[in-house]
Amino acid sequence: MSLLGRIAEKTSRLSCLRLMSVYPTHYVEPIVQKYKQLEQKNDLSKLYHVPIKAAVNKSSDTIFHDDTKHKMINYITKKGNSALARTLLSKTLELIKRTQTEHMNLAKGEKTTINTNPETLLKQAVENCRPLLQVTAIKRGGVTYQVPVPITTKRSYFLAMKWLLEAAREKERKVSLPEKLAWEILDAAHGQGRVIKRKDDLHRLCESNRAYAHYRWS
């Protein structure tokens, strides 16, 4: 991994902290899911006298809730039509399931290595598409430099899902969005495709401008 990549990885934990947070730093995150409470029941006694943050509105303890799917639905939604967005994502996951099941049935070797869980493949695709760095324009002495800076965890997930949707929307009129999005997710989950290339191009741009990294603090 490059030097800039290591710097971004070390600062990833600090990057997600808000400068104007409502809660002080000694407040701990709430445990909403009941199965996680059962897993950590031996450690709950340590939290009796520790202040805990309030759970966010979107939190849910149902086993069917998935943060990645929830965020993807929000990014797909247009003009407040979230029902259509949920339908499109459901069709996308169904196509991924059918495609992977077909590959597994046609495989002659070890079939257990083929992942047929569409939700797992969606998470893997988003993780593979997350950038570590981005460039920002900083002007020094009348010259504008493209300075590489670490990217926050929240924005890295946003860019990964945004790039997947942009790649899916660049399609022919005869191809539906769920079909094209399923292709992009499968490609990204296997470390290939246009979105992976876009992330690599951004990292190469950051690497080529690493000489200007000190302008971030000046």
Curated annotation (Swiss-Prot):
Self-association and partners: Component of the mitochondrial ribosome small subunit (28S) which comprises a 12S rRNA and about 30 distinct proteins.
S-S pairs: none
Provenance organism: Drosophila melanogaster (Fruit fly)
Record's protein name: Small ribosomal subunit protein uS7m
Main location: mitochondrion
Coiled-coil residue spans: none
Residues annotated as transmembrane: none
Stated family: Belongs to the universal ribosomal protein uS7 family.
Example of a GO cellular component annotation carried by this entry: ribosome
GO molecular function: mRNA binding; rRNA binding; structural constituent of ribosome
Keyword terms, alphabetized: Mitochondrion, Ribonucleoprotein, Ribosomal protein, Transit peptide
InterPro entries: Ribosomal_uS7, Ribosomal_uS7_dom, Ribosomal_uS7_dom_sf
Record: transit peptide: 1-19
Subcellular location field: Mitochondrion
Gene name, Swiss-Prot/TrEMBL: mRpS7
GO biological process: one example: mitochondrial translation
SUPFAM superfamilies the UniProt entry points to: Ribosomal protein S7
Lineage: Eukaryota, Metazoa, Ecdysozoa, Arthropoda, Hexapoda
PANTHER family assigned to the protein according to its UniProt record, in alphabetical order: RIBOSOMAL PROTEIN S7
